[in-house]
């Protein structure tokens, strides 16, 4: 849940503090597969591209968490506005901690879905 809140707030310093220095990160968006192995790469090479400067997160609408064996599942939905209009974005993240931080993470993203 802390990751979803920090990401939706575009608080990348807070995101960085949550990530283990040797994070194993992989993500899947509708058009691309993403990989990163350290917090700076996750932030600059992935998250800042997923939520660009022009993307205004209007609301973190829904967050749910659960446990799947040794992984935590975090599902979250955001309303986003940018010059192209209003969108909803949903992501499912699976997380494992290492030394009290996120050390393993897999994220699947719906992409920016236009709102009528």
What role is predicted for each listed range?
Residues 88-116:
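Short beta-strand edge/turn micro-motifs at domain boundaries
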Residues 74-83:
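Short beta-strand segments that buttress and anchor functional surface loops
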Residues 27, 82, 97:
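Acidic surface patches and DE-rich sequence motifs
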Residues 1-11, 18:
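Short, aromatic-enriched amphipathic alpha-helices that serve as compact interaction elements
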Residues 59-66, 78, 90-96:
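Hydrophobic/aromatic beta-strand elements that line small-molecule binding cavities or substrate pockets
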Residues 70-72, 87-89:
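Residue-level preference for beta-strand/loop junctions
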Residues 25, 76, 104-105:
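Short hydrophobic/aromatic-rich beta-strand segments that constitute the beta-sheet cores
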Residues 14, 20-71:
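A solvent-exposed, acidic/Ser-Thr-rich amphipathic alpha-helical stretch
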